[in-house]
Design a protein with these regions (language model features):
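Non-catalytic pre-domain segments flanking phosphatase-related domains
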Residues: 1-33, 139, 166-180
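Acidic, divalent-metal-coordinating active-site segment for phosphoryl/phosphodiester hydrolysis
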Residues: 1-7, 130-135, 146-158
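Alpha-helical substrate-recognition element adjacent to the catalytic core
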Residues: 24-27, 34-125
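Acidic di-acidic motifs
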Residues: 34, 145-146
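Internal alpha/beta domain cores that form substrate/cofactor-binding pockets in large enzymes
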Residues: 95-97, 101, 123-124, 151-180
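Short hydrophobic/aromatic-enriched beta-strand-loop microsegments
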Residues: 10-16, 120-124, 144, 159-166
Length: 180
């Protein structure tokens, strides 16, 4: 999976114990994405992990008008958006951004999507709340996130996959050895 991500191909490890996709929407494909380190780069997540919530909020407020760089799943979201634009009577595509961000950091995420000319059908800015219950309501066929805690919450309700991207997922060679 990491080799695919390094090559610019969206990839995730499917959680085998994830809930099955809902059959309530048979003529729709619903895909939900986390923001930082999935759709977007992990720039903001690095600030949060190094300096805390206040520094993260200040950083995002100061850079609200500057779009985030693309993360590994931007190409998939862009492809889904193109399918939505072309439209097909057989199946409808719906997308969602489900992120731990909240005000005022939500503005940069929204502006980034606008800069990319990509629309999502749902945007959930959860302010750190567990994502599972919210995803249960959207009923995605799949959810992608870079943080295992969010995946574990989501997997109780929807099919979910872990994206080994960003600061929360250091490459195995960069993890300090405990033998030292």
């Amino acid at each position: 999976m990491r080799a695919a991500l390094d090559a610019g191909v969206p990839a995730a490890q499917v959680y085998p114990h994830s809930a099955h996709a809902s059959e309530a929407h048979p003529h729709e494909v619903r895909i939900a994405f986390d923001g930082d380190a999935v759709l977007f780069s992990d720039e903001a997540e690095r600030v949060f992990q190094a300096q805390g919530l206040s520094a993260f909020q200040a950083h995002e407020h100061a850079k609200a008008s500057q779009p985030l760089l693309a993360g590994p799943f931007k190409p998939l979201l862009a492809a889904l958006h193109r399918l939505q634009q072309e439209g097909t009577p057989a199946i409808r595509v719906r997308t969602a951004l489900v992120t731990a961000r909240s005000a005022p950091a939500h503005e940069r995420a929204i502006r980034t999507l606008m800069q990319w000319n990509i629309e999502v059908d749902e945007a959930m800015f959860l302010g750190g709340l567990p994502k599972g219950e919210f995803l249960k309501e959207f009923e995605p066929d799949f959810f992608f996130d870079d943080q295992t805690g969010h995946i574990e919450s989501a997997a109780q309700h929807v099919p979910a996959g872990h994206v080994a991207s960003g600061i929360s997922n250091p490459a195995p060679s960069s993890i300090p050895s405990s033998d030292a």
